[in-house]
Every structure is written in structure tokens, then in C-alpha cells.
């Protein structure tokens, strides 16, 4: 299930960042991002486990993917594509 990221997700997302990126975003960057009026964050959750997340920024009529991460053990299963589809749908709704 893809849903909007909530503040309670941040500790797990910060850990996922470290697994997926050599230059990971800090907890404080993630925290400020979910409160930004320009950013939308989604998580891919299955059986109460967060398997991935993504971030889209919509500004001045344009959408830009900022981040997309899938747990290494769950790659090549289509999770990234599903999150990308959710971001595209959001961007279209927002006029980007």
C-alpha cells in the first residue's frame, strides 16, 4: 500500500536512507521535508513494514522527483514504479 508519509515513519525512513544512499539525508532534513508545502512524501508499506519511500517537489507548475528509495531486499519487484506512478498522479492533480 502506498500512503502519505507520517512523522512516526521518520526513524524507519532515516534507516532506509542509510541503506540506499552513500550520502543519506539526515533525520532533520526528512523531518523538515514532510512539513514543506512544496513536497509530498509517500511510503510503500506492506504488512506494517516500510519497504520504500519517495519524495516529489511541486513548485512553479513543475514536479521534480527528489528521492526514491526501495529496500535492497525488495528491489526489482515493481515498488519503485508504483511509487513513481503515485508521484505522477499527484503532480497531475497539482497542475504540474
Feature locations, PLM:
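Acetyl-CoA-dependent GNAT
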Residues: 4-73, 77, 81-94
Amino acid at each position: 500500500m502506498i500512503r502519505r508519509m507520517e512523522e512516526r515513519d521518520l526513524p524507519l525512513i532515516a534507516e532506509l536512507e542509510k541503506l540506499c544512499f552513500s550520502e543519506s539525508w539526515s533525520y532533520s532534513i526528512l523531518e523538515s521535508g514532510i512539513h514543506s508545502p512544496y513536497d509530498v512524501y509517500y511510503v510503500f508499506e506492506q504488512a506494517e513494514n516500510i519497504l520504500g519511500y519517495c519524495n516529489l517537489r511541486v513548485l512553479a507548475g513543475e514536479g521534480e522527483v527528489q528521492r526514491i528509495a526501495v529496500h535492497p531486499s525488495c528491489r526489482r519487484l515493481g515498488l519503485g514504479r508504483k511509487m513513481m506512478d503515485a508521484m505522477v498522479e499527484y503532480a497531475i492533480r497539482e497542475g504540474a
